[in-house]
Every structure is written in structure tokens, then in C-alpha cells.
């Protein structure tokens, strides 16, 4: 008489195992192709937010380790736009990152918020985060190249791209399928719809074939490639039918209800707070839990920088396409 073996408990995934191969590739490329003289990344910080300052320090440490020249410029808010324009014009600067939020919801003279205006003011040749209007528009339209000849790939937002790489590493993407179909049949719930993380992430996953339930505090929509669809699903029902749940709730008190998590689900936390009871989650059979994505995000930042360098500063184009 045979019996079915019991499913094992959940597994905690260290982001370093995903980030390290990218960092090694960056170091090797800079040493061999650029003779040790890496591209220059400028970070602009105009507020005292400790989380942003910590991220800036972390970025600088990783860049210096891997051969990228990194300079953090701390300025007053009123001087931020001028500092950004200066970095745009500096031929020795190959990438720019602004540490948001800078002005919060404060409106811009030009329409939208001041932070929106700053994002759109970064040159497409230096937008290492891929958040300016040009790259955002291409992302939502599923346009993957800068040029008509399709020799220069677009830059994608760092944290959403990091999550894609994590899902590839964990086998959620089906590499046997053509690009654009590797998530076909996969349901994913993203609990965040910010313009920085949740919305572009939902679009990227939908562009790869997934059905993505996008949840924020007031609504839930279904993202399919090129479509935003009303749905009768609730956060609970969406999570229960999802193979992947991604949490990005910027509130310390929020916890993902464990009864919403099915066996063998991938759970990824992108918030600065832990959105899940880790001990309880890891009791669910087959769960794979990624508590932090920062190391992969920084690796994607470096990857984007080298892609920008090849697209606009180096010919012929080589590895990072």
C-alpha cells in the first residue's frame, strides 16, 4: 500500500542568491570591457527620509564594490531641479537616480505633482530607473526597444524588474514558451498600485501573459496585456487563486491574512515593513517566501546603467542587450 508523501514546509529565499550572478557579471564586464573604468551614477537626495538615505548608502556601497563610480549629491529641495539639469548635461554622468519622495503630492507648475515632473525631467539617456514618460509609455504599450531597428532594449523600473528576475529564478516563468507567453495561465496578485512599483509591475507581468489582480486600498482591477478590467474578485479570492502574491503595503500594521495563501504559493514582500507573519507563512506547505528584494533591485539598477551606457555612450553595443 503506497502513500502520498506529505508536502514539506515553506522555504525562505535569500535575495542574494538571485542578485549575486548579476553583480558578478557587472564586475566582469567593467573589468574586461571597460578596463576597470566603470560608468558614473549620480544619486540626488533632497530630503531627510532615513529609509531613502539608507538605500542611497546601500546603492553606493554596492556600486563601488562592483566598479561603478557612484556620487551622492545631497541638495535642498529648491535646488533639486537645477542639480538634475546639471547632471543631465554632464557628459561624465551616465545614469541618474533621484531618491523619492521629494515633494510628496505637492503640485508642479507644469501639471501633475512635482515628483512626476522630476521623473519626466531625467534624460532618457540617463534614466537608470526607467520611470520617465518615455520609458513608462513604452512599458505600458509593451514596446521593448528604444529604436526601430530593435537593437537597443528599453530600461525597465528596477524593483518591478527585480521581481521578474526573482520569479524567473523560482521557475514561475516557463522558459519553454516564447517571450510574452511565459506567464500564460499564471494568476498573480499585487497588493500595491503605486506608479513606482505596483502599477508598472502589474503591466510587466501582464505583458508576459499573466492575469494580474492589482489591489490598492480602494479598488481591485484585473490587468491583462493592454487592458485594465473590472472584476468581482475580492483581495481574498484573488489571493487564494494566485500562484504568486506580491505585497507592497507601506504600513507597519498591515499583515497578509495567512488563510488567503494557498499551498505552493510564491510570496514576495517589497514593502519596507514585513507585510506577512513569516513564522506562520513558512508553516504552509510548499510556500516560497522572499522577505526582501533590495539586493536584486540594486543589481537591476546596475544592469540598467550598463544598458544605458551601451545604448547611448558606447559603440558597438555588446553584452547588456
Where are these predicted regions, by residue range?
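Acidic-glycine-rich active-site phosphate/pyrophosphate-binding loop
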Residues: 127, 136-141, 271-284
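Adenosine-phosphate binding glycine-rich loop
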Residues: 12, 16-28, 32-36, 45, ...
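N-terminal ligand-binding/catalytic initiation module
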Residues: 2-105
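Glycine-rich phosphate/diphosphate-binding loop of Rossmann-like nucleotide-binding domains
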Residues: 46-61, 145, 150-256, 260, ...
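Hydrophobic beta-strand scaffold residues
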Residues: 70, 212, 267, 288-289
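Anion-binding alpha/beta catalytic cores of soluble intermediary-metabolism enzymes, centered on
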Residues: 9-20, 97-183, 246, 253-254
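Generic structural signal for well-ordered, non-membrane alpha-helical segments
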Residues: 15-23, 52, 56, 77-80, ...
Amino acid at each position: 500500500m503506497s502513500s502520498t508523501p506529505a508536502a514539506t514546509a515553506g522555504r525562505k529565499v535569500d535575495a542574494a542568491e538571485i542578485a549575486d550572478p548579476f553583480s558578478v557579471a557587472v564586475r566582469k564586464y567593467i573589468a574586461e570591457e571597460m578596463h576597470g573604468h566603470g560608468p558614473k551614477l549620480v544619486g540626488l537626495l533632497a530630503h531627510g527620509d532615513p529609509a531613502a538615505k539608507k538605500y542611497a548608502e546601500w546603492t553606493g556601497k554596492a556600486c563601488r564594490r562592483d566598479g561603478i563610480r557612484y556620487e551622492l549629491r545631497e541638495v535642498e529641495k529648491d535646488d533639486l531641479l537645477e542639480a538634475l539639469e546639471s547632471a543631465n548635461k554632464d557628459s561624465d554622468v551616465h545614469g541618474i537616480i533621484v531618491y523619492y519622495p521629494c515633494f510628496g503630492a505637492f503640485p508642479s507648475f507644469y501639471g501633475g505633482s512635482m515628483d512626476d515632473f522630476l521623473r519626466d525631467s531625467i534624460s532618457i539617456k540617463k534614466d537608470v530607473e526607467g520611470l520617465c514618460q518615455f520609458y513608462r509609455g513604452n512599458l505600458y504599450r509593451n514596446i521593448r526597444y528604444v529604436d526601430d531597428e530593435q537593437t537597443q532594449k528599453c530600461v525597465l523600473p528596477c524593483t518591478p524588474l527585480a521581481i521578474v528576475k526573482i520569479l524567473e529564478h523560482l521557475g514561475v516563468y516557463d522558459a519553454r514558451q516564447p517571450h510574452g507567453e511565459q506567464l500564460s495561465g499564471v494568476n498573480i496578485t499585487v497588493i500595491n498600485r503605486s506608479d513606482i512599483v505596483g502599477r508598472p509591475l502589474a503591466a510587466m507581468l501582464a505583458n508576459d501573459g499573466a492575469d494580474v489582480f492589482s489591489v490598492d486600498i480602494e479598488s481591485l482591477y484585473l490587468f491583462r496585456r493592454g487592458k485594465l478590467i473590472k472584476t468581482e474578485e475580492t483581495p481574498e479570492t484573488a489571493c487564494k487563486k494566485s500562484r504568486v502574491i506580491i505585497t507592497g503595503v507601506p504600513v507597519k500594521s498591515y499583515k497578509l491574512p495567512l488563510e488567503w495563501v494557498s499551498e505552493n504559493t510564491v510570496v514576495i514582500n517589497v514593502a519596507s515593513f514585513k507585510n506577512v507573519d513569516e513564522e506562520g507563512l513558512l508553516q504552509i506547505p510548499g510556500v516560497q517566501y522572499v522577505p526582501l528584494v533590495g539586493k536584486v533591485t540594486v543589481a537591476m539598477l546596475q544592469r540598467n546603467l550598463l544598458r544605458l551606457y551601451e545604448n547611448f555612450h558606447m559603440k558597438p553595443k555588446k553584452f547588456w542587450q
